[in-house]
Amino acid sequence: MDVNPTLLFLKVPAQNAISTTFPYTGDPPYSHGTGTGYTMDTVNRTHQYSEKGKWTTNTETGAPQLNPIDGPLPEDNEPSGYAQTDCVLEAMAFLEESHPGIFENSCLETMEVVQQTRVDRLTQGRQTYDWTLNRNQPAATALANTIEVFRSNGLTANESGRLIDFLKDVMESMDKEEMEITTHFQRKRRVRDNMTKKMVTQRTIGKKKQRVNKRSYLIRALTLNTMTKDAERGKLKRRAIATPGMQIRGFVYFVETLARSICEKLEQSGLPVGGNEKKAKLANVVRKMMTNSQDTELSFTITGDNTKWNENQNPRMFLAMITYITKNQPEWFRNILSIAPIMFSNKMARLGKGYMFESKRMKLRTQIPAEMLASIDLKYFNESTRKKIEKIRPLLIDGTASLSPGMMMGMFNMLSTVLGVSILNLGQKKYTKTTYWWDGLQSSDDFALIVNAPNHEGIQAGVDRFYRTCKLVGINMSKKKSYINRTGTFEFTSFFYRYGFVANFSMELPSFGVSGINESADMSIGVTVIKNNMINNDLGPATAQMALQLFIKDYRYTYRCHRGDTQIQTRRSFELKKLWEQTRSKAGLLVSDGGPNLYNIRNLHIPEVCLKWELMDEDYQGRLCNPLNPFVSHKEIESVNNAVVMPAHGPAKSMEYDAVATTHSWIPKRNRSILNTSQRGILEDEQMYQKCCNLFEKFFPSSSYRRPVGISSMVEAMVSRARIDARIDFESGRIKKEEFSEIMKICSTIEELRRQK
């Protein structure tokens, strides 16, 4: 029988059907090839929005820079970056007036963080631009390389492990006339293989020292590497995102810490909270506006969209904000916070890999690296690319483009939210001094504006005033993409509000299914996702039960572990059938061993091993949870693990799930082919780093681990700890005198070696 799809919706309120219109099933689009074109688009657009600013030349790097601040007053309808400093400062002053002491308190909180943060904070994060190798690396490796180079150039403040001391090194490095760096390179040789007697190419990895003069070093330190943003749904065009180097990261972290502390105290800020907490915060603002718009007032809400938020923001504006927020604070604190925006005013965008050319006729492919774009003949390019390159040429230096105005995506989310909220704050009656007033919500570039007024003219006037006020600080509300409704129906950060938040279930669809980590983790993550959606996203019991059955089916197909008594033939069925027949208590077998599924919506919170433990045969228990089993690489067993789940919107979320280590918690080995590439040196560095950290953790189990106070290196800390522990063990008779003196001897040897080095 054919089902008419409209019948499905007869009983469903319109707002609940919204989620069926979202492009969230199936794989998201990924980008291929280089991001060079997208990056050039960003650079050119940013300059176009600020074109009436003043041009200057950076005295250190020779880069041409455009400064749109306090430029002409912005025009209607056209997005522009001409923020006016005095307007921004005034908005900050009014924000402080409405929230007495907010900046003062946030500064105090941040100061404490600045004093305590360790440099290892910078190892968090994924890909980072590594200026020593001029490409992206995992954050930990990039940091290790930077510290290594600093050390070999006589900068040693960071030995203490405090982030602030590392930043002192960064500042000093910028004053040096030259820096010596170590880079990796590959040599290829043709040699005869002894076994096969064939010629093979042998690659060897070398490290070579290279001197970089002040100008080149500064360009590298100020460079943001660019990539294409992947997996973005609902867009036709891809766009570029930036990853900054280690010199910038620490300074940005402190600025964002300050801004986060301010956002936490602002009721209109959608950051840094998320999920249900965010919904509650938003609902409060809406409730306030609706309660106050008594029968005499109209209340309307704009679901807002800003045109090119990042490209019209300006680091110079952020500098003004920070200067205001930190007034009356100690000089060192003001200095350290003002460095990030200053670095961003002088930033360079790396254009990525360059362009790929292929000649169909001659079957040739060649890469034109970004460095060549400044000099290459443009006749090889098509019309649109030619225009891009012509526009960007005056800005190019060594394959990077000078990009003074604008912020790259995701750098100062918190601080830009503070700016947005400061405009929402001006909507109070005491500031508008008329019959209309407004309030709203801001989360990075997304906003919702609620306007109240006695009549429609008042609403219109309020919206106009908000629009123009935003223009003065470089925020461009898009008239085309924002829409207005009676208060009670709007969308904000993909939350749909209809007299309360409607669950937008389609957002969670991508996270259902089998993750592909291993049998144990996948089972646990799968049921946790269903459980979480019952709690947070209106997933009803019947649908949840169905989701569970689909998940189990999916899981069995993925791991080819159909029930032992099934007819389905796979390459595992022979073994699983044998196990099924040998097992007395078949209910005790895990699903991944061909057992039955005992999950239902009431017991999703229990890990499968625990759920079935009492039902298992004894020898099965022994095999399943045996620490000596050679097939299991047992990490220390944490009771809770973190999985990365992909919601449809926003970054990958980290989700906790219960982890019980069994023979099914295997960890796949690293691909061998990496060992023959130029990445090898990096891999070795990374393993070295890992080993050091593991060793350190052996000396300082987490229970006794306090933040190291005072200045000592990891080695010194471990040696002194070893001495203390040895003495205690010797005095309590746990170790013999010979062992004690041997430990003491080893400690002295280590210290001696350190002194010689």
From Swiss-Prot:
Major location category of this protein: host cell
Domain of life the protein comes from: Viruses
Subcellular location: Host nucleus; Host cytoplasm
Class of enzymatic activity (EC top level): transferase
Keyword line: Eukaryotic host gene expression shutoff by virus, Eukaryotic host transcription shutoff by virus, Host cytoplasm, Host gene expression shutoff by virus, Host nucleus, Host-virus interaction, Inhibition of host RNA polymerase II by virus, Nucleotide-binding, Nucleotidyltransferase, Phosphoprotein, RNA-directed RNA polymerase, Transferase, Viral RNA replication, Viral transcription
Keyword Transferase recorded: yes
Region described as Promoter-binding site: spans on this chain: 249-256
Pfam families: Flu_PB1
Keyword Lipoprotein attributed: no
Catalytic activity: RNA(n) + a ribonucleoside 5'-triphosphate = RNA(n+1) + diphosphate
Compositionally biased region (Polar residues): 55-64
MF terms (GO), sorted A to Z: nucleotide binding; RNA binding; RNA-directed RNA polymerase activity
InterPro entries: RNA-dir_pol_NSvirus, RNA_pol_PB1_influenza
Region ranges (Disordered): 50-82
EC id: 2.7.7.48
A single GO cellular-component term on record: host cell cytoplasm
GO biological process, one term: symbiont-mediated suppression of host gene expression
Annotated ranges, domain RdRp catalytic: 286-483
The record's account of how the chain is modified after translation: Phosphorylated by host PRKCA.
Motif Nuclear localization signal: where in chain: 187-195, 203-216
Family listed: Belongs to the influenza viruses polymerase PB1 family.
Subunit structure: Influenza RNA polymerase is composed of three subunits: PB1, PB2 and PA. Interacts (via N-terminus) with PA (via C-terminus). Interacts (via C-terminus) with PB2 (via N-terminus); this interaction is essential for transcription initiation.
Function: RNA-dependent RNA polymerase which is responsible for replication and transcription of virus RNA segments. The transcription of viral mRNAs occurs by a unique mechanism called cap-snatching. 5' methylated caps of cellular mRNAs are cleaved after 10-13 nucleotides by PA. In turn, these short capped RNAs are used as primers by PB1 for transcription of viral mRNAs. During virus replication, PB1 initiates RNA synthesis and copy vRNA into complementary RNA (cRNA) which in turn serves as a template for the production of more vRNAs.
Protein name per Swiss-Prot or TrEMBL: RNA-directed RNA polymerase catalytic subunit
Species whose genome carries this gene: Influenza A virus (strain A/Port Chalmers/1/1973 H3N2)
Species classification: Viruses, Riboviria, Orthornavirae, Negarnaviricota, Polyploviricotina
